[in-house]
Amino acid sequence: MAAEKIETVVAGNYLEMEREEENISGNKKSSTKTKLSNFFWHGGSVYDAWFSCASNQVAQVLLTLPYSFSQLGMMSGILFQLFYGLMGSWTAYLISVLYVEYRTRKEREKFDFRNHVIQWFEVLDGLLGKHWRNLGLIFNCTFLLFGSVIQLIACASNIYYINDKLDKRTWTYIFGACCATTVFIPSFHNYRIWSFLGLAMTTYTSWYLTIASLLHGQAEDVKHSGPTTMVLYFTGATNILYTFGGHAVTVEIMHAMWKPQKFKAIYLLATIYVLTLTLPSASAVYWAFGDKLLTHSNALSLLPKTGFRDTAVILMLIHQFITFGFASTPLYFVWEKLIGVHETKSMFKRAMARLPVVVPIWFLAIIFPFFGPINSAVGSLLVSFTVYIIPALAHMLTFAPAPSRENAVERPPRVVGGWMGTYCINIFVVVWVFVVGFGFGGWASMVNFVRQIDTFGLFTKCYQCPPHKP
């Protein structure tokens, strides 16, 4: 029988209730089938967390970043990627600190998390009360809902470049049904092989975009006029804000780890790798096609149809299925807790209970099929609060009392100036994101989004489709 031993692991002041990995310790005679299952299916290491963070962060935005560069210009595009990558890593660190603080306090009260997945709104509830819980729940769930919608839209947008016999709306119906199968993936523990494959797929696509654009050379009469208007400039900036705001699932990824206290620098390391994919590909595509990207939000649409491009499309489709699972799984958990089946051991019962969550995702993807502009709108209105403003404010309020700072499980690193430096950085994040991300970005993104509705209409069958060739 597999070991069910619970160890108390001391990491600073942090008492973590760590459960040994099933069928690895204490069962040396486990079958080959079980070992393979553990290897591919049961992930909880630092490496699993890194793959999950990197894979989740660089999904379909890889295809829309050249579009953002055409709005921003080359220099601003590069600088915003570096700036928001660093800022996103900082707020992911804050979320990890708050998670560890919350979990430590609960475990000192003998709370057992073996059949319960901790989520961000519960961290806010435990540290700051029900009003913060409600705020976190509303913003996080809405962001993850539209994050799932964006992946579904991206699936339809990409497959159209291989098979245009069906319009994008029909492809959305088909991929909505395919993505609904993610209800059978229990938790982030079970994304081990998917995270690895997803990152490998986006790595291929990134370098395909880079190399194919360089080999293609600059298009005839190419122009690089960005930025031309304030609306386009801040729309592009908020798409990059969205790109590096993929840590809305940080708490769930941490909870899937065997030793969550080791998460601290993982998101930063994942971001560094992601930048090696996004900077070359976005720069190369923008260099090759320039202003043409303003009317082609999907970078694949401008590259010639080849076997390499078709491979990139197929790999991105698979990866978007994986990222759909990343975005929707926390929603599944919230729904399970709401209807009282979260701690049910029957995975089939939980899967059936999750299915209603897919319906609104499917419906919204059909209403707003605006691949590219929807990223900026979600970035400015939801990501700005969910993963930047709320974590920074929550961290400041949690440790505002002197006793909380003295007894903190994770103290700020000296390199940022201790508590004083941390508060200064947090205040800067809140002010910058509120003014630039939510304020200017929200205005620009909504103006652009409304233009798409006026031009194409809601429920449009085939957004930005070229004339059909018989």
Swiss-Prot record:
It comes from the Eukaryota. The chain crosses the membrane at residues 58-75, 78-98, 135-155, 171-191, 193-213, 231-251, 265-285, 313-333, 355-375, 377-397, 427-447. It is a multi-pass membrane protein. Keywords: Amino-acid transport, Auxin signaling pathway, Cell membrane, Membrane, Symport, Transmembrane, Transmembrane helix, Transport. It is found in: Cell membrane. It holds the Pfam family Aa_trans. One of its GO terms (biological process) is root cap development. Residues 1-57, 99-134, 192, 252-264, 334-354, 398-426 are cytoplasmic. GO terms for cellular component: plasma membrane. Residues 76-77, 156-170, 214-230, 286-312, 376, 448-470 are extracellular. Its main location: membrane. One of its GO terms (molecular function) is symporter activity. Belongs to the amino acid/polyamine transporter 2 family. Amino acid/auxin permease (AAAP) (TC 2.A.18.1) subfamily. This is Auxin transporter-like protein 3. It comes from Arabidopsis thaliana (Mouse-ear cress). The lineage of its organism: Eukaryota, Viridiplantae, Streptophyta, Embryophyta, Tracheophyta.
